[in-house]
Every structure is written in C-alpha cells, then in structure tokens.
C-alpha cells in the first residue's frame, strides 16, 4: 500500500466543513455501514441511505460530498479523503480494505476501533466534569467577592485612616482593577489565550508544550498511558488487516494530535525504515511508551506473534486508561481544593485582620 499517494490525495482534496461530527456518530455510521456491506448492498446506495438518517445529520454534508465523489468515479477511499470528519487513519484503512478486497471486514474493525476510542474519550470527559465544575464555581465566587463584597469594606478601611496590611492592600488593588478595568482585563486574557492557541498550532511552542506535559508534568505518566493505548489500538487494527508495520506507523504518526509524539513517531519510522533499529529498539530508545509496552514489542518480534501481542497491548492499555484517569483525578481534585482554600484563606485573613484593628480602635 502506497501511503505517499494517499497523503497527496488528502492534501489535494482538503476542504472545509462547518462542523466536525463526534466519534460516537462516526462509529455508529461505520457500524451500520458494515451491516449493509455484509448485505451486499452497493456502496453508493449505502451512502445515500445513511446520509438521509436523522442520527447522521452532522455527517450529511460530508456524505453528500462522498456520494458526489463516488458518482464522479472516485474510489471509496478517495471519496472520503480530505474531509475533517474522516481522518488520515480512516481513509488509509478504507484504502487498505479496497486493495485487499476485504472492505467489509475493515469497516467492521474500524467501527470497533472508533467505538473503543469514543468510550475512552467519554470516560476522560466524565472524569473531568467535577474538577471543571469546581474550578468554574471557584472563579465565579472569586469574581463575585472581588466585585461586590470587597468594595463594601474599602470605604470602612479608608475612613478609619489606618495602615492596612500588605495582603489587604493587594486584595483591594485587585478588586479595584476588576471593577474599573474588568473589560480590558477580559480582552487581554482572551488575546493571550488566542495567541497561545495560535502559537501551539503554528510554532515549535506546541512541540515543547506537549513534551513538557508528557515528560515533566505531574500528570505525565497518565498522559503517556492514554497515548500508549491509542498507539497499541492503532497498531492492532492496522496489523490485523495486513498493513505493514511501517505503513501503520506513518498513518498513526499523521493522525497523532500530540505534537511531541508526532515528532517521535516520525523519528521511529525513519530509524526502522533505515534498518538502524528494530521496532522494540526504536520505541525503547525514545522512552515514549511504558517499559512493559516495549518489552512486549520485543517478545512479539522474537516470537513473530505481532498480531496477538498488539491485540493484547491494546486490551491491556485500554484497561490501564481507567486507572490512569482515576489516578489523575485523585491528584487533581485535592490540588484544586487546596488552591481554592488558599485563595479563600487569603481573602478572609486580608479582611479580618484590619477589621479587628478597626474594632479595637473604636473600643
């Protein structure tokens, strides 16, 4: 299978869609696609049938284009190529299915692949709900206090003509800034966030940030497990459908969102392609996957049972993701609570100390 040709097609056919369908819609679409393929219904009829279903409303603009491409004589993989709803991994697997004459099996395997991916992402999202609510609630309460509560004490403190503690002066300055220049501060924050997003996407900043988050941050271990699960799952499905290791790696590399891993996988591909290292040696050198992952790769190469090992790795690390998520939350929640307690404590102390001084002065 020639990956280079598919990369060129993806670039040429690249287009904009107003929105991107969820992974859930994608695996449900593939599940029905697989059933209809097994029923020997022509592909163009399958696409036309599925695009009219309400549950695939988000996919309809994309499927309209796929239908048009098929009618214009393009192959199945070419018809899906270039659409943001169908990534490089998806179109590469479809091309493999066409070339091998096993499109029905590939589509079924893809439906299971995206279903497992969706399940993992959903678990991560569900685990983040409480920390997000905690953070948002804390920010809203802090802004409310700075805008409405603190100013009521300012007049009292100023009328007492007393020397305020440093913490109180800082608190009053922040409160005044929020009240007087709140809109300007908000605009600056939005510009900073937008600048960071652009820098992440367009410059080396994205690579170094992802490298730090994966190798140096307190949550690096959990992040490494999640990405290792993704790599193992992808290697499993590509090898199961007779794709070479090199072709599988380049597709995984092109589909990888983490910029640090994207570069590391590119280097691994080059080292294996040149014959400089074996698969296990290249991964072990880079240290981007856990040692257990690398050890199982070595066993796979020694025994020739790559398919079985990839499948076991996939199942193992999909399970490890749940423990990684629980570990992540067990660290994050206390950190958030402690941080909020420090902020609240700072505000309380900054208000109560001068309040006692005011009361004493009256006495």
Where are these regions (language model features)?
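Membrane-interfacial amphipathic helices
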Residues: 1-27, 31-34, 209-223, 291
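Membrane-interface starts of transmembrane alpha-helices
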Residues: 56, 87, 180-181, 185, ...
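Membrane-cytosol interface motif
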Residues: 162-172, 210-227
């Amino acid at each position: 299978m020639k990956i280079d040709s598919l990369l060129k097609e993806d670039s040429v056919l690249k287009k904009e869609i107003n929105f991107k369908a969820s992974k859930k819609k994608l695996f449900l679409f593939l599940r029905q696609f697989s059933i209809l393929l097994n029923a020997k219904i022509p592909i163009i009829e399958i696409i036309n049938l599925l695009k009219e279903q309400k549950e695939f409303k988000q996919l309809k603009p994309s499927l309209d284009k796929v239908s048009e491409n098929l009618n214009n004589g393009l192959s199945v993989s070419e018809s899906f190529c270039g659409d943001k709803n169908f990534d490089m991994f998806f179109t590469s697997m479809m091309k493999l299915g066409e070339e091998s004459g096993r499109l029905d099996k590939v589509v079924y395997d893809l439906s299971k692949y995206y279903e497992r991916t969706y399940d993992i992402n959903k678990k991560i999202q569900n685990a983040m709900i409480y920390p997000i609510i905690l953070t948002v609630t804390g920010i809203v309460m802090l802004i409310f206090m700075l805008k409405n509560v603190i100013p009521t004490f300012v007049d009292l403190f100023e009328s007492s003509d007393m020397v305020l503690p440093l913490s109180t002066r800082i608190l009053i300055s922040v409160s005044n800034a929020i009240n007087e220049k709140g809109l300007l501060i908000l605009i600056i924050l939005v510009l900073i966030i937008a600048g960071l997003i652009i820098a992440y996407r367009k410059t080396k900043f994205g690579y170094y940030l992802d490298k730090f988050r994966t190798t140096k941050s307190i949550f690096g271990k959990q992040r490494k497990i999640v990405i290792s699960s993704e790599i193992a799952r992808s290697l499993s499905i590509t090898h199961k459908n007779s794709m070479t290791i090199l072709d599988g790696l380049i597709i995984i590399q092109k589909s990888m969102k983490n910029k640090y891993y994207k570069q590391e996988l590119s280097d691994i591909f080059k080292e294996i392609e040149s014959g400089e290292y074996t698969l296990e040696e290249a991964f072990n050198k880079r240290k981007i996957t856990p040692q257990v992952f690398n050890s199982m790769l070595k066993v796979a190469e020694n025994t020739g049972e790559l398919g079985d090992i990839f499948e076991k790795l996939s199942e193992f690390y999909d399970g490890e993701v749940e423990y990684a998520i629980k570990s992540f939350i067990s660290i994050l929640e206390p950190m958030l609570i402690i941080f909020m307690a420090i902020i609240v404590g700072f505000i309380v102390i900054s208000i109560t100390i001068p309040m006692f001084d005011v009361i004493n002065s009256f006495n």
